[in-house]
A protein has these predicted regions:
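N-terminal chloroplast transit peptides
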Residues: 1-4
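Binding-site signature for planar aromatic cofactors or substrates
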Residues: 8-314
């Protein structure tokens, strides 16, 4: 139960109007050595920068997001739209002249785009919000360029060349709000986002995670047990990048019930630059974990079966 309690306490700690310490009347206990080990591992596990995570999500997302525009009544309006990222990770769009958000942008370019992770299910999953100006493209060369960018992301969007569809792009980026899940959030300066590169492994993250979850979940559980000393009931990889992977796990609690899923970061011993590198890294980590845990089990067995030494008197 500690994992769920600790996870939510991280979120609560940011709310100044809630009681802190023992003020809420609930008893507090010191974490066990195992819990301390897991906490320390999580603090030190290698992670992408917020800018890299946000850029990767925009770049390798499914190309859909929620655009928010200023309506004629000066209220925010939202719509689910298709987008395509350019080389800077800024979104381009193709909108019908009849759409409400098209009319909004023609009058006021201030807007934002919110993109969630492809498998978004709730507050523990990642989302990014780009805020800036979205303007219609009028230059013929730019128009050709951004139509090609859009078609590359959405090959079936043949209507992008229709006369009643206009091409827009985000021309200025004011700020980026990124939330990677519980207790992982940041406002990213535009310069950091523009300079960051999308992580090359995240392009294949869904395929890697799907394969591991379907065929090799025992290997993931083995790696976590070796790295953190935590035996999992289930371990579902949610994301993979060159530095490691994010895993949703459940554990058996003292009352023998299974916990709610919670997120763990599992770092790689070294960077995996591509899909093949990740595969090799996971094989290596699985073999190392199996060998180490086998050796530990043999040591424990030897300690319990070795008879105590007896002293003899002369």
């Amino acid at each position: 139960r500690w994992f769920a309690t600790h996870r939510h306490s991280v979120v609560r700690a940011k709310k100044e109007d809630e009681p802190q310490g023992h003020q809420d009347g609930r008893p507090r206990r010191e974490p066990t050595e195992k819990e301390k080990r897991i906490m320390e591992y999580q603090q030190n596990a290698p992670k992408l920068s917020f800018a890299e995570e946000a850029k990767s999500q925009i770049t390798f997302g499914n190309g859909y997001g929620v655009i928010s525009t200023i309506t004629k009544d000066d209220y925010p309006g939202g719509a689910v739209v298709m987008y395509a990222p350019d080389d800077d990770g800024l979104p381009a769009f193709s909108f019908s002249t009849m759409s409400g958000h098209t009319q909004d942008l023609m009058k006021n370019s201030k807007a934002s785009l919110t993109v969630t992770s492809n498998d978004f299910k709730g507050a523990a999953d990642a989302r990014v919000n780009l805020v800036g100006d979205i303007e219609k493209i009028t230059d013929e060369e730019e128009l050709k360029k951004y139509r090609e960018i859009f078609i590359k992301k959405h090959p079936n969007a043949f209507w992008v060349n229709f006369g009643d569809f206009l091409v827009f792009r985000m021309t200025s980026l004011k700020h980026i709000r990124y939330v990677g899940g519980f207790a992982r959030a940041a406002t990213i300066p535009p310069g950091e986002y523009l300079e960051a590169s999308a992580d090359p492994v995240m392009e294949f993250a869904e395929k890697i995670a799907g394969h591991m979850n379907e065929d090799h979940q025992d290997a993931t559980k083995l790696i976590i047990e070796h790295q953190m000393g935590l035996e999992c009931e289930s371990a579902e990889i949610k994301n993979v990048d060159r530095l490691g992977m994010t895993v949703f796990v459940t554990v058996k609690q003292p009352d023998q019930t299974v916990s709610s899923p919670f997120k763990l970061r599992v770092g790689f011993p070294e960077e995996a630059p591509d899909r093949v590198g990740v595969r090799n890294m996971l094989k290596r980590m699985t073999n190392e974990a199996a060998s180490a845990l086998k050796a530990e089990a043999e040591e424990e067995e030897a300690a319990t079966t070795t008879p105590p030494s007896s002293s003899t008197s002369s």
